[in-house]
Structure formats: structure tokens, C-alpha cells
Amino acid sequence: MSINICRDNHDPFYRYKMPPIQAKVEGRGNGIKTAVLNVADISHALNRPAPYIVKYFGFELGAQTSISVDKDRYLVNGVHEPAKLQDVLDGFINKFVLCGSCKNPETEIIITKDNDLVRDCKACGKRTPMDLRHKLSSFILKNPPDSVSGSKKKKKAATASANVRGGGLSISDIAQGKSQNAPSDGTGSSTPQHHDEDEDELSRQIKAAASTLEDIEVKDDEWAVDMSEEAIRARAKELEVNSELTQLDEYGEWILEQAGEDKENLPSDVELYKKAAELDVLNDPKIGCVLAQCLFDEDIVNEIAEHNAFFTKILVTPEYEKNFMGGIERFLGLEHKDLIPLLPKILVQLYNNDIISEEEIMRFGTKSSKKFVPKEVSKKVRRAAKPFITWLETAESDDDEEDDE
């Protein structure tokens, strides 16, 4: 038996089908859960990763979920009838599968260079945006599909230089229109390739400025750079102190100046992002620490969700998350000690909105550090996280017991 992917479509010749949801209730008491048995089949029919579907159930039903792709086991806490889950799945299909123009399900999720989500329709050719305010959008941005087309996201390169702005090319390469993936002509040179859609703003600005300059002949034998380990460390330290720190300080001061003492005039998320790009601090993980200290006041628990989409766009790696949590630690331990008891609620918001990963929250709550605050302050703050950490550990142990059965 199969049903229409778009259940509102009653055309007898409608050819897009999927299996109906199959589910069964497991356990009893506080540990009762609903196992969704055929998520993999539904995932295949919708061309969407199975975790997206289960996470959507969790967000819409207000329930915790357990996802084990390897074991093909997907659980949603609580009792949920298949009919109810099918209705919730309709919402997922409308928001994250069907084309916003022709309502055809032949779409792929595209993550653009600006970290926006769009549905690329293979039927009508249109691209329609998805709602970034939905919690699942944050999850998708942090866990992109295996094959992301359109934005042509590349896997992390093996060298650090390949992951910086400009694709690891020198300024002169960018000015000459060379691309990181430009084919070689056999002489070591590359053929210019123009990808205006993927090219970042900084590269375009460099090209525009460089096009007005005369060619300069560089003779390799006229100068040399000391590449000893000591010299590299010295230069790195000097750059960090004189450039990065200054730019981050300027960014933090700008936020506080714009917001005012009561923070009623806090810049919008768009303005915050544009200013960070202008000061070139988006690639510095320490921006997370600055944001955590500058954006919040006594109402931090409610304010976190207001910036959900922005944080998802900024906190793109564990290092960014670690710095953000360090900023939270400074905010509570040094500036608002009276708010330390609210830390479990703060962690709930960060966890439920997929801003900070479970791994980073566990690390933060179980090990003190003197990186951001004095050791004693760190212990006091992180000790307050214990109720939430205990809940996380209990949830994990319950899932393990279910798997053993």
C-alpha cells in the first residue's frame, strides 16, 4: 500500500507515492517511546535524510528523539499514533519537500553561499526558499545533505590555506581571475574560470582593486621570509594581538554602542552579520565569545531563541561553539553572577534550538577550564549545569537500554 506524497492532491494519475507511516509504542512509564519503523523507506521516497524527518517530529511534538541511522532505529519520546505522525509529516513535506511554486516533490535542498536554504525543483526549474526560522532549518544547516548541489559545497581541504577566503589562492591569483579548481595547462598555470555566483564579496573587491594596478614583476631571489618555527610563531602572535583582537574588540564595542545601556536598540541579526563581514571577523571562532557577552541581558533565556538563525549561521564548527560557551561563562561568572542558577534553562534553549551540539554541552558541563575565566569561577558556573547534564546522561542511558532489549 502506498499514499500520495502530497495528500491534498486527489488526481488519480498522481505518480509520486510513499509508504504510510508505521509506528509502535515501546516501553512504559516515564520511559515510553514511539518507534517509527519505516523512516528509511519514507526518507527514500521523499529524497530527504531520515534524521531530518525524525528531528521534525521532535520539534513539532515537543519531544526528544533518538536517531540511530546505522541500526535503522528512530524513536520519539511519548505515545504518538501513526495517524498523528502522518499529519505531522504532511507539514514536513509542505515546508521542506514540495516546490513552493508547482507543488512538485522532485526537489533537492540547496544551501547557498549565504547559508540560506532553498528547494531546487527539477520539474519547473524554480528555486523557492525555506523558512530559516524553523528549528529544523538550523539542524539542516549544521547537518547538510550528503550531496549538496547548487552551492557546490566542498569538503574541508587537507590544507589550512585551502579553507580561507579566496579558496587558498594568493591575492595576485584572485586578481588574475584564477580559480582554485581551474584546470592546469601543463605549464603550471591555471585557466581563469569565473563563478560569480559562488565567488565571495571579498574576492570581488580584491579583483576590482587589483584591476587598476600595474603588473609588478616579482623576483624570487631578491627577498626571503624566515620560515623557522620561532619566526612563524612570533608573526602569528603579532598578527593576533595587532589585528584579530583589535577587530573583535571593535566589533564588540560597536554592538554595545548601538544597543545602549538597556540594550533596547540592539542591531538586527542582519546588521550584526554585515558588520562582522565588514570587519572580517566571521572566520575567527572568537567571534562566538564576543557575541555571547554583548547580545544578552537578564532575559538571556528568552533572547537565545530570538537569534537562533543568526547563531546557526555564525557557529559553524566546534571551535566556534566552544568560544560561544566561553562567552556565556564570562557573561554569567564575571558580569551576572545572579543569573548563574539559570544556566540549565540556558542550556535547554541552546540544545533545543540546535545552536550548540550535545557533545559541546557535555564537555562544558563536566570539565572546568581557566581559558575564559579564573578556575574557581569556571567551577562555580559549570557546577550549575549539573541538572541538565544529568538529564542528558539519563536520556542517553535510556536509549542504550532500549537498544540492548
UniProtKB/Swiss-Prot annotation:
Residues 143-202 are annotated as: Disordered. Keywords: GTP-binding, Initiation factor, Nucleotide-binding, Phosphoprotein, Protein biosynthesis. GO terms for molecular function: eukaryotic initiation factor eIF2 binding; GDP-dissociation inhibitor activity; GTP binding; GTPase activator activity; translation initiation factor activity; translation initiation factor binding. It comes from the Eukaryota. GO terms for cellular component: cytosol; eukaryotic 48S preinitiation complex; multi-eIF complex. Residues 177-192 have a biased composition (Polar residues). The keyword Phosphoprotein applies. It holds the Pfam family W2. Coiled coil: none annotated. The modification Phosphothreonine is found at residues 191, 317. Residues 241-402 form the W2 domain. The modification Phosphoserine is found at residues 170, 172, 228, 397. PROSITE patterns: W2. GO terms for biological process: cytosolic ribosome assembly; formation of cytoplasmic translation initiation complex; negative regulation of translational initiation; regulation of translational initiation. InterPro entries: ARM-type_fold (IPR016024), IF2/IF5 (IPR045196), Transl_init_fac_IF2/IF5_dom (IPR002735), Transl_init_fac_IF2/IF5_N (IPR016189), Transl_init_fac_IF2/IF5_Zn-bd (IPR016190), W2_domain (IPR003307). GTP binds at residues 27-34. Catalyzes the hydrolysis of GTP bound to the 40S ribosomal initiation complex (40S.mRNA.Met-tRNA[F].eIF-2.GTP) with the subsequent joining of a 60S ribosomal subunit resulting in the release of eIF-2 and the guanine nucleotide. The subsequent joining of a 60S ribosomal subunit results in the formation of a functional 80S initiation complex (80S.mRNA.Met-tRNA[F]). eIF-5 is essential for cell viability. PANTHER family: EUKARYOTIC TRANSLATION INITIATION FACTOR (PTHR23001), EUKARYOTIC TRANSLATION INITIATION FACTOR 5 (PTHR23001:SF7). Monomer. The factors eIF-1, eIF-2, eIF-3, TIF5/eIF-5 and methionyl-tRNAi form a multifactor complex (MFC) that may bind to the 40S ribosome. TIF32, NIP1 and TIF5/eIF-5 comprise a minimal 40S-ribosome-binding unit. Interacts with NIP1. Interacts with SUI3. Present with 48300 molecules/cell in log phase SD medium. Belongs to the eIF-2-beta/eIF-5 family. This is Eukaryotic translation initiation factor 5. It comes from Saccharomyces cerevisiae (strain ATCC 204508 / S288c). The gene is TIF5.
